[in-house]
């Protein structure tokens, strides 16, 4: 044993340059592997951050008609009625594994039906939200107050605006206490809200630009019980589901869509609830990143 070690040491010493180059190659190889793994991990974390808004862990589930997202403002030319969700389905979603919270909401995008005096709320969004929406989506009240249960029970015509909508509609005025018109109905602004993170998306496509444009124009929110006053009865709702971790977002979104599709014959009906495809968004981002190099 000792003799073998002595011979090995003599061999290394007699071929110092070759031994040095061999060790250098091994060191460079190990360092390269570490660098590649670190880069992949960093890219994966960036993709996760792009997809979820830096830690919100929420996934949207939207009603589709055929290959397109359903737009309640225009309906469908074939006259078929969209499916409606129930409170029981919401509770079933909340009870799914890895779900922390869930919310149903009505929505109109690029809304032109909201006014403050002579100012139109062009390009923003209006949501009819339930009591879970603000906490699920990470909103905090900046001024005034949020919705309380009596606002829902008594169908009070009150509204919340986010900070972007406050800037665009009120031009520096304090919006709390002001009256805005939504679908020809007066609503009193009771609070200003803002999402707790200051996430700025990494815009790479026109769809991402449109989404970001709506975000910077702002959002107006009213209690979901008041939605029929401003818009229509029996409009379909979409959902936001909060997972307990980023790794469970895809499975949670898929499971929630299955619950929401209960009662819909998805083989014959063109209506179907679909969750955001988190993995496909990740693959698209990777391709865009690679093509831009």
Model regions and ranges:
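"Rare, low-scoring activations can occur
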Residues: 218-293
């Amino acid at each position: 044993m000792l003799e073998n070690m002595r011979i090995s040491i003599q061999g290394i010493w007699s071929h110092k340059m070759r031994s040095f180059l061999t060790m250098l190659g091994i060191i460079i190889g190990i360092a390269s592997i570490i660098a590649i793994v670190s880069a992949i991990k960093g890219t994966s974390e960036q993709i996760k951050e792009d997809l979820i808004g830096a830690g919100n862990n929420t996934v949207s589930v939207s009603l589709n008609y055929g290959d397109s997202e359903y737009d309640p403002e225009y309906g469908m030319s074939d006259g078929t009625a969209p499916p409606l969700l129930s409170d029981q389905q919401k509770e079933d979603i909340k009870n799914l594994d890895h779900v922390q919270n869930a919310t149903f909401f009505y929505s109109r995008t690029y809304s032109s039906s909201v006014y403050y005096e002579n100012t139109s709320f062009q390009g923003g969004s209006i949501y009819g939200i339930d009591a879970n929406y603000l906490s699920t989506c990470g909103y905090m009240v900046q001024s005034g107050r949020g919705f309380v249960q009596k606002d829902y029970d008594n169908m009070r015509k009150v509204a919340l605006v986010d900070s972007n909508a406050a800037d665009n509609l009120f031009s520096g005025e304090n919006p709390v206490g002001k009256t805005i018109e939504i679908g020809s109905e007066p609503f009193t602004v009771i609070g200003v809200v803002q999402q707790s993170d200051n996430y700025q998306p990494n815009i790479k496509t026109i769809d991402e630009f449109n989404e970001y444009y709506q975000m910077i124009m702002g959002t107006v929110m009213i209690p979901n019980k008041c939605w029929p006053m401003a818009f229509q009865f029996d409009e379909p709702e979409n959902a936001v589901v909060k997972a307990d971790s980023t790794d469970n977002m895809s499975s949670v979104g898929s499971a929630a869509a299955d619950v929401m599709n209960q009662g819909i014959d998805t083989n014959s009906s063109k209506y179907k609830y679909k969750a955001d495809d988190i993995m496909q968004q990740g693959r698209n981002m990777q391709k865009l990143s690679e093509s831009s190099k």
